[in-house]
UniProtKB/Swiss-Prot annotation:
GO cellular component: cytoplasm
Purpose: Reversibly transfers an adenylyl group from ATP to 4'-phosphopantetheine, yielding dephospho-CoA (dPCoA) and pyrophosphate.
InterPro entries: Cyt_trans-like, PPAT, Rossmann-like_a/b/a_fold
GO molecular function, one term: ATP binding
UniProt-annotated binding residues for ATP: T10, F11, H18, G89, L90, R91, E99, N124, S125, F126, I127, S128, S129, T130
Swiss-Prot/TrEMBL catalytic activity: (R)-4'-phosphopantetheine + ATP + H(+) = 3'-dephospho-CoA + diphosphate
Keyword rRNA processing tagged: no
Cell compartments where the protein resides: Cytoplasm
Cofactor list: Mg(2+)
Family assignment from sequence similarity: Belongs to the bacterial CoaD family.
Binding-site list for substrate: T10, K42, L74, R88
Alphabetic keyword roster: ATP-binding, Coenzyme A biosynthesis, Cytoplasm, Magnesium, Nucleotide-binding, Nucleotidyltransferase, Transferase
Protein name as it appears in the record: Phosphopantetheine adenylyltransferase
Amino acid sequence: MHTRAIYPGTFDPITNGHADLIERAAKLFKHVIIGIAANPSKQPRFTLEERVELVNRVTAHLDNVEVVGFSGLLVDFAKEQKASVLVRGLRAVSDFEYEFQLANMNRRLSPDLESVFLTPAEENSFISSTLVKEVALHGGDVNQFVHSEVATALAAKLKLAKP
């Protein structure tokens, strides 16, 4: 175990599916960097700083995990962090085509950067940040899909957003 890996994403918010993949990646790699993207093409509910804080809380028990916000190209962030592996999650066959294209683009931009795909535990295979936000927005209980601190933060965020 000698590799630095990056698990990139928007994490808006971090779900139990994300947390499961982070825990498993932490067992596979010496150091895992959770790269939280400041993706300008998306309009996240949580600020970059809030997302970094929530992921830090959820992963606090993992000594070899570091949480870093970033903007720009993922391959540049990987070089900056001296990472040689990208960890990506595949929930369903529908994720594969996009992830395959992304892996090939990343390989073209940075030939030494390898993509590794992990599938979630069955109980997490349907969870997405988008679905969690939708359930919460309509008053549903999201505690089975996210860490309790995330559920609390999401409820507060949605309450503030209501007119």
